[in-house]
Amino acid sequence: MTHFTVSCLLVALFLCQSLVHAAYNGYYGYSPAAAPYPAEEPQNIMNPVDSCWRLKSDWDVNREDLADCAVGFGSSTLGGKKGNIYVVTNPYDNAQNPHPGSLRYGVIQAKPLWITFAKDMVITLANELMVNSYKTIDGRGAKVEIAYGPCITIQDVTNVIVHGISIHDCKPGKSGKVRSSPTHVGHRKGSDGDAITIFGSSNVWIDHCYLASCTDGLIDVIHASTAITISNNYFTQHDKVMLLGHNDNFVKDVKMKVTVAFNHFGPGLVERMPRVRRGYAHVANNRYDKWIMYAIGGSADPTIFSEGNYFIASDKSYSKEVTKREVKGGWNNWRWRTSNDVFKNGAFFVPSGYGSIPLPYSSAQRFTVAPGNLVPSLTADAGPLNCNRNGPCY
């Protein structure tokens, strides 16, 4: 039996199980009825996002099918679907007057575009990259890096997909003029040095990217951004990994809903995987390898549902706890819950809150969350994939 036949059979079994999204009762969480998953961890199984498209050998001529595969709060993200294909042919950048063929020229256009790359390239941006609405940055088929300069800003826009690229060693942007559309060049005060900043935006999906070693955060979701899915990414070698929520006093972030699923939080990470303020974070089927301070934290009464994750604590006695509340007290009623998580090497999760905690997904957003023991397989291919034309992506 071939590798892909086994994958298909296991995926079919995986997707047919009843959904684990019931209301949560009691202080310590619910225990949903056991689904008939394999007792032993299978070696060839794909998560629901990947099984939607990766087995198709015609992915290169049907790239926009990817937009049908997101799950969770960002599942309706269109990106550049139904727009033209725009091909990046060179790595050069001009922040004010970008030239055709450059990445910046594509992302600032007003119309929907599905952006691909003609060849491998390392893009060092002159200033932060302002991405307009209805854009997909699709790195499949090439090795694409954005590195050694300012990186990506998704601000006050909607429907953006970033897939299959590496973003690392990002630096703060300079104060100065940056073009954000064909008709607008605005003065920017200078970006913080995040890999990706999502500011006041909705319907954003970050999938199969590699993120590491930036000046500030790897992903910041702030200023009432919502309908976000962050999936299948590989994070490594960084301090403050992922921030969800601007600050404790920014009450509009109560509307924020973010799904963090199927990611691999690898070695050399310190904290914020994620750190949440006010909003709702569904953290599902992620792998955590030996964080240095804590894995999941928050302040300002966020709701955090940790489901089916795989936590491996470090050998240090002071970093066994998964959770951290960024306050000295008063958090007993915060709704932080764990269900079907796996804890290794002494890792433990401190829950809080009472009563039910429904998962507010629509029928289109729901996906089956596997038990935590399957996570090593479900996250084995996190980060950019090796995609060859006329064949599936590995």
UniProtKB/Swiss-Prot annotation:
Which cysteines does the record link by disulfide bonds? none
Give me the reactions it catalyses.
Answer: Eliminative cleavage of (1->4)-alpha-D-galacturonan to give oligosaccharides with 4-deoxy-alpha-D-galact-4-enuronosyl groups at their non-reducing ends
Q: Which Pfam families match?
A: Pectate_lyase_4
GO MF term set? metal ion binding; pectate lyase activity
Q: Pathway it acts in?
A: Glycan metabolism; pectin degradation; 2-dehydro-3-deoxy-D-gluconate from pectin: step 2/5
Record keyword Signal present = yes
Q: What superkingdom does the record give?
A: Eukaryota
| First-level EC class | lyase
Give yes or no: UniProt keyword Ubl conjugation: no
Q: Where is the signal peptide?
A: 1-22
Positions that bind Ca(2+) = D192, D216, D220
Ordered alphabetically, the record's keywords are:
Calcium, Lyase, Metal-binding, Signal
Task: Please list every transmembrane segment annotated in the UniProt record, as residue ranges.
Answer: none
Q: What is the recorded name of this protein?
A: Putative pectate lyase 17
Q: What is the lineage of its organism?
A: Eukaryota, Viridiplantae, Streptophyta, Embryophyta, Tracheophyta
